[in-house]
Amino acid sequence: MRVLLAGGGTAGHIEPALNTADELRMRNPAHDIRALGTSRGLEVRLVPARGYPLDLIPAVPMPRRPNRDLIALPSRLRASVRAVRDVMEQQGTDVVVGFGGYVAMPAYLAARGRVPIVIHEANAKPGLANRVGARFTPYVAQAFPDAIKGAETVGIPLREAIVNLD
């Protein structure tokens, strides 16, 4: 299976993504697992350190108030979606697994109608990308009950070293 992980910017998005990748790889070392990221997120260090390829795409931050960045948003988003589609085509992606953050929205839009999307929301209050992405897929998991209506509550993916603490 060829899996494209989309979650970046902060460790809160990246760690659950990498922990999921580790579990998938443990279950089947033949899985082709790649991650999306931006050049300014923590994923630039964390993803390669865990042994996964990282594909960089343009960041598309959502302006919090009307300004010039809001005018540029549609063209930036289109460019980022195109970059994700290029990665998906190169990899032959079978599924996009998203965890929120700057890279998740373009990934969800690129995958919509092409490959299945699986979303995990680790926060009690979901971010914009996961709220929008959850409309595109029935496969939504959450760490906290009632974060996203209809999502299955599964907790947060943890590293095996943490799970096995005494």
Regions found by a protein language model. Name each.
Residues 3-6, 11, 30-85, 154-155:
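Conserved nucleotide-sugar phosphate-binding/catalytic loop shared by glycosyltransferases and other
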Residues 112-166:
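Active-site-proximal region of nucleotide-activated glycan assembly enzymes
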Residues 1, 25-30, 113-114:
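Short helix-capping segments at alpha-helix termini
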Residues 10-11, 101-103, 124, 128:
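Residue-level detector of alpha-helix initiation sites
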